[in-house]
Amino acid sequence: IKVCSPISAQAILESGWGESRLAKDYHNYFGLKCGTKWQGKSVNLATWEEYEAGTAMVISDYFRIFDNMEEGVKGYFELLQLPRYQNLKGITEPGRYLETIWADGYATSSVYVQKNMELIEQYQLMKYDENASGRSAQDVLNVMRSWIGYSEANGKFRQIIDLYNSYLPLARGYAVQYTDF
C-alpha cells in the first residue's frame, strides 16, 4: 500500500472514531462483512446499505469479529489480498484509491468517496502518506490509535461528532449524541 490516508479515513468513518458497537465490542474498525470465505467468528447486526443512489435501507448482515484492534486492522489488509482489490496496488493518490475500492464493491454509499475525502482534508491525513511506500498494517494501526477515543477535554469532541452526524445515511443508522461518551 502506497497511501495511508484513505485507509485511516475509512476506519474513522466506518467505526465512528472507534466508538461504534462494531468497533468497541468486536474490534471491526472497517465494517468488514463476512462474505462467503470468512471462517472466523461473526455477529449479525443491522446496517445501512444504498443499492440505489440516494436511497438507503436497513438490512441485517454478518460482520467479522476480531479478538483485538491489531487483528481488526490486519483483517482489512487481508481483505485487500482478494483478487477484486488487486487494482489498488501502486495507487498513490487518496481520491483514486477511494474511487477504486468503492468501484470494487467495498461500500455501497454513493457519497462514500466524498465522505472519506472530507475527513482526509479536514484532519490533514495526507501527512501520513509521505514516504508511505512499504507501509504496513502496524503503521495504519499507529495512526488509528492516535485518533480513537477523543474526549470532550481535547477540544475535538463536538467537531468530530458533528462531522460524523453530517453524513447521511448515518453509518449503522445512529446519530451520535454528545452524551454517548
What are these regions (language model features)?
Residues 1-133:
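Catalytic cores of secreted/periplasmic lytic hydrolases that degrade extracellular macromolecules
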Residues 131-181:
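N-terminal capping segments
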